[in-house]
Amino acid sequence: MKHYVGLAITSIFIITGCSNNVETQPAKTETVQSQPKNKETANTIPQNFYKEITSGKIAHIHGIGYAGNMPGISIATHSGIKVYQNGKWFETATQLHDYMGFQATKNGFFASGHPEPGANFKNPLGLMKSSDGGNNLEKLAFYGESDFHNLAVGYNTEAIYLYNERPNSKLQQGFYFSTDNGQEWKNSKLKGLSSTIHSFSAHPDQSSVVAVSAKDGVYLSTDYGNTFELFSKSVESTAVTVSNEDVIYASINKQNEQMITKKSIATNEETNIQIPSLDSKDTIMYISQNPQNSSEMVFATMKANVFLSTDGGKTWKQITKEGSLQYN
């Protein structure tokens, strides 16, 4: 579900909402142990916290990425984090929270959202951080005050960008950034933006660089979101991620076809990446590239279809089909 939120005159954010639908809870089997280097990732997962599951369905996806301290692809859902790793699926044994604004980083993840029923947390969660796959959550800011549906965090810098939908004790409505784990915040002026914004992504190593996907293309800022320039024009861009060298974004062309494009920040060279055909009523909402392996990328759609490529987009395999977990 989406709804529109106005941000003064400069832009309009589309905020991904929550649903009351409950996801199917699959049976849990074996415990995940630390994994050796594999073709998709090469990190360490917390032992005895993630359990392998043999079936399941994701109702809504609230973020996707590669946490640097866990192997596999982490997917934030309405009821906790699920991880896809080499044809297998895992989920957390506890901490089944409704994570929103999920952002994977080198040392774990950042998120907001709502606690699971009965959990000893205030609602909403505010801004949280975890360095152990979600087993422990560190309260950074706005605990019990705000639910941030739109976050972007630098993979290595941990610079935080967020859109605050409603005023809280520190922030008015608007776009803000922090470079000290959410202790201090500065407002971004967003000069140069004039159309609907779908999402934004922070550069992994340069705190001042942030990209946004918008109604008329992709915009790029190098001064903490104070000024933006049109980086790539399209009919509409629905999702974006920034790597060290490229901006990778999903767009819709004049034929109403969805596509993914990789564009060099330094040279402006564009490469169109072939993707599987999608339903015209479905939309790419999240893209993530593996920071440890640039040939691997994953994207997720509004209807909870997730596709993975390990060869730079030459071939794809579907790992969820309208939310149903696929084992391949």
Q: What would you call each of these model-derived segments?
A:
Residues S19-V22:
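Bacterial signal peptide processing site
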Residues F49-K82, T94-F102:
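Beta-strand-rich domains and repeat architectures in extracellular enzymes and scaffolds
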Residues I61-G63, H97-A104, E145-V153, S195-A202, ...:
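Repeated scaffold domains used in trafficking and secretory/extracellular systems
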Residues I73, F109, I160, V209-V210, ...:
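Hydrophobic beta-strand positions that form the internal "hydrophobic ladder"
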Residues G118-P124, R166-Q173, S213, I252-M259:
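Short, solvent-exposed loop/turn segments at conserved positions within beta-propeller repeat blades
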